[in-house]
């Protein structure tokens, strides 16, 4: 393991976050800390993960897409952000691609993703 990867692994361990195993096609609920003036609250953002970037490094991120009031909304979250309160996998999707950018041009039934019923957690 090279020096940079070793430093990143130490930083990830220092954060102490537990990131669930999720991939493109999964529906996730991200609890994001929002600060409004002096108050801080957790806002949930639920949608389909259309891509992950950066593997499991400290700079990794993932893109979540949802339909809000008939408009497609995408948001990119840094995986190890201090503003992320929680990541919860709502359902597992069965897809054959790592990046689901084709969902941007689809609406309704053609944008559906089949659910995985026989998912097994990865043991580490």
UniProtKB/Swiss-Prot annotation:
Belongs to the bacterial ribosomal protein bL19 family. Pfam families: Ribosomal_L19. InterPro entries: Ribosomal_bL19, Ribosomal_bL19_CS, Ribosomal_bL19_sf, Translation_prot_SH3-like_sf. GO terms for molecular function: structural constituent of ribosome. This is Large ribosomal subunit protein bL19. This protein is located at the 30S-50S ribosomal subunit interface and may play a role in the structure and function of the aminoacyl-tRNA binding site. One of its GO terms (biological process) is translation. One of its GO terms (cellular component) is cytosolic large ribosomal subunit. Transmembrane segments: none annotated. Signal peptide: none annotated. The lineage of its organism: Bacteria, Pseudomonadati, Pseudomonadota, Alphaproteobacteria, Rhodobacterales. Keywords: Ribonucleoprotein, Ribosomal protein.
């Amino acid at each position: 393991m090279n020096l940079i990867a070793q430093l990143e692994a130490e930083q990830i361990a220092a954060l102490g976050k537990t990131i669930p195993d999720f991939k493109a096609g999964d529906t996730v609920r991200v609890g994001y800390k929002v600060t409004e003036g002096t108050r801080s609250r957790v806002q949930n953002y639920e949608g389909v993960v259309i891509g992950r970037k950066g593997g499991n490094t400290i700079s990794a991120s993932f893109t979540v897409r949802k339909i809000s009031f008939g408009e497609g909304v995408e948001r990119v979250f840094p995986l190890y952000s201090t503003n992320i309160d929680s990541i919860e996998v709502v359902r597992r999707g069965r897809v054959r691609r790592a990046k689901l950018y084709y969902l941007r041009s689809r609406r309704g039934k053609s944008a559906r993703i089949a659910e995985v019923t026989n998912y097994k957690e990865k043991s580490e």
